[in-house]
Amino acid sequence: MGTKGREIVGEGVDKIIEKLNKALADEWLAYYQYWVGAKVVKGPLREPISAELSEHAGEELAHADKLAERIIQLGGTPLLKPEDWLKMANCGYAAPENPCGAAILEQNIKGEQCAIGVYDALLRELKGKDVVTYDLVLEI
């Protein structure tokens, strides 16, 4: 499948794969940030905040899966080592050192704002060049 995907996308496919791997790194870090935040959150609204964070963690994991599949379809290899996530990520990782619900939510909102910017730039770059990847990013 990788050969056909590369053929359809044409020149620039390696750059697209690199950007998808950077987005994949972001999704893995976002997954962990939501997941660990759901575990350590404290305060009177702990239960609903934990439930919301857990739901978002599942969404981020699904995004990572879709990105990895597309990278493979294009003939690339998804990032293989967790240490590469921090090196490649656009948005980084904010450890939930303050377990207060409001602080954890604020960290995650900042992460989502960064992801929106990354995906917006990727959409502009992909428009008219790679319809399949464009649609995937739009879905995410």
Residue ranges and their predicted role:
Residues 2-23, 101:
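Disorder-to-helix initiation segments
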Residues 5, 10-11, 47-48, 54-55, ...:
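Charge-rich, acidic-biased intrinsically disordered regions
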Residues 19-26, 30-33, 37, 65, ...:
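Acidic/histidine-rich alpha-helical segments that form the ligand environment
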Residues 30, 35-37, 41-84:
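Conserved alpha-helical segments that form or flank metal/cofactor-binding pockets of metalloenzymes
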